[in-house]
Curated annotation (Swiss-Prot):
Enzyme Commission (EC) number: 2.7.2.11
The name this protein goes by in its record: Glutamate 5-kinase
Localisation per UniProt entry: Cytoplasm
Record's GO cellular component terms: cytosol
Keywords: Amino-acid biosynthesis, ATP-binding, Cytoplasm, Kinase, Nucleotide-binding, Proline biosynthesis, Transferase
Function, as annotated: Catalyzes the transfer of a phosphate group to glutamate to form L-glutamate 5-phosphate.
Binding locations of substrate: S50, D137, N149
Binding-site residues for ATP, renumbered to this chain: K10, T169, D170, T211, G212, G213, M214, G215, T216, K217
Amino acid sequence: MSDSQTLVVKLGTSVLTGGSRRLNRAHIVELVRQCAQLHAAGHRIVIVTSGAIAAGREHLGYPELPATIASKQLLAAVGQSRLIQLWEQLFSIYGIHVGQMLLTRADMEDRERFLNARDTLRALLDNNIVPVINENDAVATAEIKVGDNDNLSALAAILAGADKLLLLTDQQGLFTADPRNNPQAELIKDVHGIDDALRAIAGDSVSGLGTGGMGTKLQAADVACRAGIDTIIAAGSRPGVIGDVMEGISVGTLFHAEATPLENRKRWIFGAPPAGEITVDEGATAAILERGSSLLPKGIKSVTGNFSRGEVIRICNLEGRDIAHGVTRYNSDALRRIAGHHSQQIDAILGYEYGPVAVHRDDMIIR
């Protein structure tokens, strides 16, 4: 084995269930065995697990997935305890302790909570404990959900300071077309930079029991790679897949980390789920993309959502394209009032000001 590395392993519902309505315990046992081998060799392992709702369905005997949020949260509440018990039981066979972390979008949006989550996660790793992370589906509504465990795993990789992120799924990796519909589809083994062509290839296929498709895996890979983390999409059913990834053996699709990763604060900005959105005019778009300028109120055309000063927001051009994320210096109500006005008018309009810019260039990430 090479020197000690930190690996985040994301296990989708389709991997944990094998496409059935029940957890595939035999397969989970094998995945734990692989992780335990790496742990014994000195590597640091983080598990991002799906499957809480599936575990709840199995335990309570629900034949179908309910449609209401309340019923899904009920299943998640029951299933989450079953799931962590399973991880704890299996890792204990190898004398390994696990620690549960349940996160929501709010933990990622707020810088202080983000840093607290980071400190907790790294404390677990420093004490040779395997963190088991999931979104807190029992309490998370649409407004506070990260959205899927692919993106959650990318955020976990940033929190952990990971070297690699492994997204295990029911597919071998990213193909040139959907291999389930096109027998001519070819596996893409290496990716250097994610563009619109790749996003179009990924589409939005979703497994029957999960919430993430190949499109969300590309989003996760984009976030992780820009933070300097190699990302691999591979089949969870492949024998020895986790160990092979750590050995550097070609498995699935490898998204190469950027040579110059984002600094720590900008990793948070890039990874945090946006709390809202603003649309800017052509002049502001050009200033941001071509000249690296801050965003002035004059260039703002509209504001969507309700957010506070200091939260991360999405900046879009007139066509709706996501061009940047940044930390806003004004809340949503204030931005609506000063949108389209010169910076010199801020104090007269609001009765106060936090400076002439809406989003400073130092607090902005170009998408």
